Amino acid sequence: MSQEAILEKVRSIVAEQLSVDAGEVKPESNFQNDLGADSLDTVELVMALEEAFDIEIPDEAAEGITTVGDAVKYIEDKQA
């Protein structure tokens, strides 16, 4: 899956999970600061990404995923 395809899928999931417009979801968007996610939202978002991409994101890795771009890079690395 290309980086662009991953970004589009992540953008769609983030927009749905956080009830924000997909246009607001940019690679540099921070889940908490820019998109208004709280800690529970973040956990649910990680679970949704795991399910959508059929990957496992350990807690240690999830703590380092703070932006949309971080999520895309992590998923891209897991699929390589």
From Swiss-Prot:
GO terms for biological process: lipid A biosynthetic process. PROSITE patterns: CARRIER (PS50075), PHOSPHOPANTETHEINE (PS00012). Keywords: Cytoplasm, Fatty acid biosynthesis, Fatty acid metabolism, Lipid biosynthesis, Lipid metabolism, Phosphopantetheine, Phosphoprotein. One of its GO terms (molecular function) is phosphopantetheine binding. Pathway: Lipid metabolism; fatty acid biosynthesis. Its main location: cytoplasm. NCBIfam families: acyl_carrier (TIGR00517), PRK00982.1-2 (NF002148), PRK00982.1-3 (NF002149), PRK00982.1-4 (NF002150), PRK00982.1-5 (NF002151), PRK12449.1 (NF009104). This is Acyl carrier protein. It comes from Synechococcus sp. (strain WH7803). The gene is acpP.
